[in-house]
Each structure stands twice: as structure tokens, then as C-alpha cells.
Amino acid sequence: MKLTHVDEKGVKMVEVGHKKDMYRRAIAKGRIKLKPETIKLIREGKIEKGNVLAAAQIAGILAVKKTFDIIPLCHPIPLTGVDITFDFGEDYIEVTCEVRAIYKTGVEMEALTGVSVALLTIWDMVKAVEKDEKGQYPYTKIEEIRVVEKIKEERS
């Protein structure tokens, strides 16, 4: 297998100018484990810092838009849509980030960046109630960040 970002001259951004614009979609998911009491506070809108889910959605969308600034060899991509959604478990929130574009390269890095930043934002918003008496986070954990779907298709 040949690496596309590295050659004998060093690191490079892959040339995609010759590629055809195609519909691209990627969906990434990840979870944050939280204390059940914290989940309850989020659902009831009682986190002192503010609306946890709205903050996570905004942060995730912004992160998707800035992926090319964060990951050095990613192309700036003209996005057509981003959705950040949440599913609750007893002791976790699962975040899903769906990214869409019509472009020459895929959007999976954007979806992974969006879900990661949304999860980090949730952590930031709830850290006051997640800390133990020593200021540590024995229960809080971000896990299972992954791409669950990637689509590339021609559209007429």
C-alpha cells in the first residue's frame, strides 16, 4: 500500500484537482460516560454553565467547519450540511455527527472532528458535577469514537 501524503520529498497535501465532484457523506459516533445524576441534570436543563446540548452542537458544527485548520493535510471542503444529534443511555450520551458535501474528497475527518469536539464540550460543560472530592474524574470517559458510515456517489 502506498501512502498518499508522504513521498521521497516529504509530506504533502494530496492533489485532488483532477477528481470529479461527488456527493460525500460521513457519519461518526462517540460516547461520553457520565454519572447518572449528571445525565439527569442535563436532561432537566439544570447544569449551571448552560445548555449542554446546544453548546455541544454549536462547538461540533464549528469544529467540522475548521477541520482543515486543525488537521494539517486536510483539504478545505465546501460543506452542504452538518447535523449533531444525541442519544441518551443511563450513564452515557452518544453523539452522532453527520457531514455532507459535494466535493472531490471525503468528509470522514470532518465528522470525526465534529463528534470529538462535541464530546469535549459536553465534558467541559459538566466538569463541575463530574469531579470527585479530590477534583478528579473517576467516572467520566470519552470512548468509541469511530466512523460508522461513509458514502461516495455520483449525483446528476
From Swiss-Prot:
<comment type="similarity">
    <text>Belongs to the MoaC family.</text>
</comment>
<comment type="pathway">
    <text>Cofactor biosynthesis; molybdopterin biosynthesis.</text>
</comment>
<keyword id="KW-0456">Lyase</keyword>
<protein>
    <recommendedName>
        <fullName>Probable cyclic pyranopterin monophosphate synthase</fullName>
        <ecNumber>4.6.1.17</ecNumber>
    </recommendedName>
</protein>
<dbReference type="GO" id="GO:0061799">
    <property type="term" value="F:cyclic pyranopterin monophosphate synthase activity"/>
</dbReference>
<dbReference type="GO" id="GO:0006777">
    <property type="term" value="P:Mo-molybdopterin cofactor biosynthetic process"/>
</dbReference>
<dbReference type="Pfam" id="PF01967">
    <property type="entry name" value="MoaC"/>
</dbReference>
<keyword id="KW-0501">Molybdenum cofactor biosynthesis</keyword>
<comment type="function">
    <text>Catalyzes the conversion of (8S)-3',8-cyclo-7,8-dihydroguanosine 5'-triphosphate to cyclic pyranopterin monophosphate (cPMP).</text>
</comment>
<dbReference type="InterPro" id="IPR036522">
    <property type="entry name" value="MoaC_sf"/>
</dbReference>
<dbReference type="InterPro" id="IPR050105">
    <property type="entry name" value="MoCo_biosynth_MoaA/MoaC"/>
</dbReference>
<dbReference type="InterPro" id="IPR023047">
    <property type="entry name" value="Mo_CF_biosynth-C_arc"/>
</dbReference>
<feature type="active site">
    <location>
        <position position="124"/>
    </location>
</feature>
<comment type="subunit">
    <text>Homohexamer; trimer of dimers.</text>
</comment>
<dbReference type="InterPro" id="IPR023045">
    <property type="entry name" value="MoaC"/>
</dbReference>
<feature type="binding site">
    <location>
        <begin position="109"/>
        <end position="110"/>
    </location>
    <ligand>
        <name>substrate</name>
    </ligand>
</feature>
<dbReference type="InterPro" id="IPR002820">
    <property type="entry name" value="Mopterin_CF_biosynth-C_dom"/>
</dbReference>
<feature type="binding site">
    <location>
        <begin position="73"/>
        <end position="75"/>
    </location>
    <ligand>
        <name>substrate</name>
    </ligand>
</feature>
